[in-house]
């Protein structure tokens, strides 16, 4: 076991505080409409430029191990806030820095760290309740646009695009953020169920001008097996040919003579047919095939259920109004499945999402939910250079998370005003002793930090502006973008309640742990033992030469 370096008391806390301040100072310059950029070096390629707090925090590692522990603990605040609400990382980092700095001053002055923490916790619990009282619902398109705009660093086009996407696929619908190709941001909405599997043969294409397969009112055969023998498909092919309708086959795989027979039938016009592989792998593939069967009113032909492809009939097939297949995707539009069956299937998925342990599983389950619910919206972000593209994409993702949070818990006045108002309302709060009162004051002072930093980044005097805002009431605050005072709601400067609440709670939680830290332990740096033995052969030979 490696030897450890141990530091106690004030010595440990000073080191930890240095790390906290290095990380927080790098992150907080990005806050507000006039926040500055941070340039991040990459091991290869061009450096990236960002105004996203969590992106900056993730890049910071310090050489001194004790300082690095402080930095990593604040990084945890940013990550937790990001995971909970998708935004508010810079605010959370700033709140944590303020609480730690003020709290450690009080500890150095002889206050009891545990009582300080209790005071901070008491203030935060009251502040969260007041935030909920200040919160107003965010349901209309205008409010959603404003929240998206603020979170995307005052980019109105992004805010409008997110509001449009939410209008089209619903507040709970899946909205993806992708890299576009042009210079304009675009919104692409896919109605119906789409999955990432294209046609198995280009000979199925019946629209050569667009390079796609289009099937009108097709039957849909779903098989949870590999099909290579044409004989087991003949009965169903004959039945479909008699009906005069096209056929889509979705199976684990289709190969050999089975695929060749379908291609020949399709090119000769005997049966209008196309085949694609089933989406996903393993259990996820079975679940997605079941989703498609519910959506189209058919059955999955599965040997596990003792179903035989050779004995299947038209009643086992699903149907849809239209199917469009290109080389990469298949889209099923207007499935004829029973609404009650679809709703029942949809209601199962939220429970599975709660039980899922990995983010990847949750993401895939959310995708399934959206596809069954009837649509996926894709935001295509475009920019002139790759560096700008990455920065813009991160901002759009932040804005999307913020708008979802706003719809969930409502909004409060932005620009740091809500926390200042909350601090004013609970200013008479008292603890059980004087040390707890100091803890409460530490938390109240920290609640002014976001407003002060926004003002500082815009080049104004923080104390003057903060006092002016404190003298006002309600939503009265400072618009740093235009350098004027007024009603923040009228200015369209809104913060999601969930983002502000999460930032405050996570900051206080981690900062409280840091204030009550008394000892820090880390590995001693390993010394490079350069062996003298490596140079001995040459030295020995030289000595022998002298003797001769």
Swiss-Prot record:
GO MF, one annotated term: unfolded protein binding
UniProt biased composition (Gly residues): 539-548
Enzyme Commission identifier(s): 5.6.1.7
N-terminal signal peptide: none
UniProt superkingdom: Bacteria
Chief location bin: cytoplasm
Residues binding ATP, per UniProt: 30-33, 51, 87-91, 415, 479-481, 495
Localization of this protein: Cytoplasm
Family statement: Belongs to the chaperonin (HSP60) family.
Subunit comment: Forms a cylinder of 14 subunits composed of two heptameric rings stacked back-to-back. Interacts with the co-chaperonin GroES.
Function per UniProt: Together with its co-chaperonin GroES, plays an essential role in assisting protein folding. The GroEL-GroES system forms a nano-cage that allows encapsulation of the non-native substrate proteins and provides a physical environment optimized to promote and accelerate protein folding.
Protein's recorded name: Chaperonin GroEL
Source species taxonomy: Bacteria, Pseudomonadati, Pseudomonadota, Gammaproteobacteria, Enterobacterales
């Amino acid at each position: 076991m490696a030897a450890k370096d141990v530091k106690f008391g004030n010595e440990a806390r000073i080191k930890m505080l240095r790390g906290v301040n290095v990380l927080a100072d790098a992150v907080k310059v990005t806050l507000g409409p006039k926040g500055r950029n941070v340039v991040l070096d990459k091991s290869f390629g061009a450096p990236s430029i960002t105004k996203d707090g969590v992106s900056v925090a993730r890049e910071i590692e310090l050489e001194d191990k004790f300082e690095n522990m402080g930095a990593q603990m604040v990084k945890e605040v940013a990550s937790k806030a990001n995971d909970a609400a998708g935004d508010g990382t810079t605010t959370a980092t700033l709140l944590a820095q303020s609480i730690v700095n003020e709290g450690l001053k009080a500890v150095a002055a002889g206050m009891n760290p545990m009582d300080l923490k209790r005071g901070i916790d008491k203030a935060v619990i009251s502040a969260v309740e007041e935030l909920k009282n200040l919160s107003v619902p965010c349901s209309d398109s205008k409010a959603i646009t404003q929240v998206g705009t603020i979170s995307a660093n005052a980019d109105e086009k992004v805010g409008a695009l997110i509001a449009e996407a939410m209008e089209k696929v619903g507040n709970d619908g899946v909205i993806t953020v992708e890299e576009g190709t042009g210079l304009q941001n675009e919104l692409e909405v896919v109605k119906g169920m789409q999955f990432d599997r294209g046609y198995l043969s280009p000979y199925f294409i019946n629209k050569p001008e667009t390079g796609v397969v289009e099937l009108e009112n097709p039957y849909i055969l779903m098989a949870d097996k590999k099909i290579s023998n044409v004989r087991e498909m003949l009965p169903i092919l004959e039945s479909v040919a008699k009906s005069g309708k096209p056929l889509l086959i979705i199976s684990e795989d289709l190969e050999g003579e089975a695929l060749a027979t379908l291609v020949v039938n399709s090119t000769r016009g005997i049966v209008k047919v196309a085949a694609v592989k089933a989406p996903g792998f393993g259990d996820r593939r079975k679940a997605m095939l079941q989703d498609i069967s519910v959506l189209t009113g058919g059955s999955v032909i599965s040997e596990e259920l003792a179903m035989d492809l050779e004995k299947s009939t038209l009643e086992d097939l699903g149907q849809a109004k239209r199917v469009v297949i290109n080389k990469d995707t298949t889209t099923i539009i207007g499935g004829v499945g029973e609404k009650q069956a679809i709703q029942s299937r949809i209601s199962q998925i939220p429970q599975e999402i709660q039980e899922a342990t990995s983010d990847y599983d949750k993401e895939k389950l959310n995708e399934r939910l959206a596809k069954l619910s009837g649509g996926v919206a894709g935001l295509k972000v475009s920019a002139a250079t790759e560096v700008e593209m990455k920065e813009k994409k991160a901002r759009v993702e932040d804005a999307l998370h913020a708008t979802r949070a706003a719809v969930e818990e409502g909004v409060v006045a932005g620009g740091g005003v809500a926390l200042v108002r909350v601090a004013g309302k609970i200013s008479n709060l008292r603890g059980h002793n004087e040390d707890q009162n100091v803890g409460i004051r530490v938390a109240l002072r920290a609640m002014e930090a976001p407003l002060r930093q926004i003002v500082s980044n815009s080049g104004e005097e923080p104390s003057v502006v903060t006092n002016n805002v404190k003298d006002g009431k309600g939503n009265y605050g400072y618009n740093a973008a235009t350098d004027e005072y007024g009603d923040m709601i009228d200015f369209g400067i809104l913060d999601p309640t969930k983002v502000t609440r999460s930032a405050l709670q996570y900051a206080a939680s981690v900062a409280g742990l840091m204030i009550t830290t008394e000892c820090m332990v880390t590995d001693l740096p390993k010394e490079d033992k350069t062996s003298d033995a490596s140079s001995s052969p040459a030295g020995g030979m030289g000595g022998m030469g002298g003797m001769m």
